[in-house]
Amino acid sequence: MKRKLVIVMIIVMILSTVNGIQRNIVFASEQEKNNENSYWSTKNAPIIYGATKITIKKGILDSFDVKDARFRVFAKDFEDGDLTDKIKYSGTVDTNTVGEYKITYTVQDSHNNITNLDVKVYVTDEEDAKINVERTLYTIPSMWNLDMIGVMRCNYGDRQNLGIYLPEGVSIKARILNADTDLRVQYITNDANKEISQTLSKNGDWVTLQNIKDGVGYSSVPLITSAVLSKENTDLTKTYKIELEYDENVKELNYYHYKDNEENFMNKWEQDQNEYGLIENEVIQVVVPLADKDKMTNYHRNGFATLDQYLEYYKKVVDRMDELLGVSLNPEKLTDQNVRTKYLIRANAHGAGAAYYNGNHVGVNSSSVSAFFEMNWGGLHEIAHGYQGSLGKGEMQLGEVANNILGHYIQIDKSIYTYSGDWLGAINQIEENKNKARLEGKTYNEQDVSTKLYMIVNLFDHFEGGETYAKMFKWYREQINNGRTLTNQDAYVEAIADIYNFNIIPYMESWKINISEETKIKIYEKNIPMLGVLKDTVEDEDVLNKILNGENINEKYGLVTNETLKKYNAVGNLKLTIKIDDVKKLNGKTIKIIDGNNVLKTVEINNSVILVQDLPA
């Protein structure tokens, strides 16, 4: 008799110290990990970042507040995301008594990994003392798998605040204490024509930071762009340090972080009257002009009751878009690795269109960012531009379409998009209109944006809707990683064939989308079921209705296979055009029309145009 082997797991507690941060790491079971080389791990401890060493002049502050944006810390965890609201702290600072003080911060993730951080606060009475803050900055792991297919999201536009608001004419000094790359500081206003960016050198030189454009100073919110690590550097705890020095003319940033006290935030901003404030969670940060302060909540028809509701909505949106991209924090394949990054949303009086996406931020073309505080199609459309990549570009023109695919599947998901609204419309209600131009001979690239989207959604909905897009992205990344080069239309055809074992070339060609000869040969040699447009194939209305009812199909222009048509003895006519200089050379020869291995009909060539009638499915 065989005996069962019982494995006893021992949990070991290790206390480690890195850059003054203590991590109590609980080595839990890694059985949940889907790929041993992915970033995901039960052993990953949270990191604490923000103001990690502080010096202030005696009496410059009435009191020390750990929520003061200048002195605040935050926490994030690769698996759990933002943990800032989970931070616990102890310790006090007497701002009127010279001395060294300590604030201890502690945060624990869902795998019971604990990170502790002691922040030293020095109160000095030196005459020329200024506020001095050392800030720890997080870094972002490589997103090589998204880079290789051109999916940028806002990966290289993730920014961290410095806790300050710079009034017009006010400057600060800054330098890098520890980083192996230069860092970029950008001043955000509500007009790109009123802002610049500056670079902090990794050599540690002090830089005077001030937003002066063409000799004119402007108030602004300085943000520093998060560094993205190389593929070889997989240290998720890697941080950089910078040092800031400034006087009392530099203002505390009016700042709201997810789950903060909204009333306190609004009251403080009303009191300060700073020209800009900042709200954020782990997926989105918005620089808000003072004029929009009362337009963020309870203002728009499709607006939000609280700032947390707003931030939660965009968290759901971005999470869902990541799912539609086919990426995961705990992937089975490394090509599907996800990494959390944050979108910057801003007003820009000199932007483009109504709103725009430019790779490192989303802008509202106005001096107001208020429009982004409403649940609407525009927000989905612009955020999703970051997800297009090379699969959304190419000969099959999807420039303003690939992003709308994501927007569509989110908008019809009423667990996320809770207001009424469907930019595309119900497929069975719009299909006659959307197929009109196609049947008149227009190519896919000649269609309007809405019709192009309809064509894709009609295809995806035959399978698994948005999940089909996710599976296609997974397939596509794997192909590109293996060194292949594909047009987007060939990628669509090959992906559907490999994933679902169907040939969609007839559907693609019905929209006059050109598939390469190489791909045609490859797919037709598979002898897999072909999918075509139902109403294109069946002209008899009685037969059409029998198929619709019998197969529980809602769309006349939905996709069907020949096997389905055979069940209803459907027949159709086929027009063949032979392009040759002298068709007489082919007289007497025959053409076999086949479906897989079955010969449906044999016709003799006697003209350059041949009409085949009553062709069985």
Predicted features and spans:
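Positively charged n-region of N-terminal signal peptides that target proteins for export
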Residues: M1-K4
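Sec-dependent signal peptide cleavage junction
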Residues: L15-K33
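Solvent-exposed, low-complexity, repeat-rich "mucin-like" stalks and linkers
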Residues: E32-G81, I164-Y165, A174, A570, ...
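Serine/threonine-rich, repeat-prone extracellular segments and beta-strand-based repeat modules
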Residues: E79-T124
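Beta-strand-enriched, solvent-exposed domains that form extended recognition/catalytic surfaces
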Residues: H111-L117, V121-N254, K575-A617
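Beta/coil-rich, acidic/histidine-enriched accessory regions frequently appended to metallopeptidases
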Residues: E126-L137, S142, N488-P616
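Catalytic cores of extracellular degradative/oxidative enzymes
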Residues: F265-N267, E275-E464, T468-G483, Y492
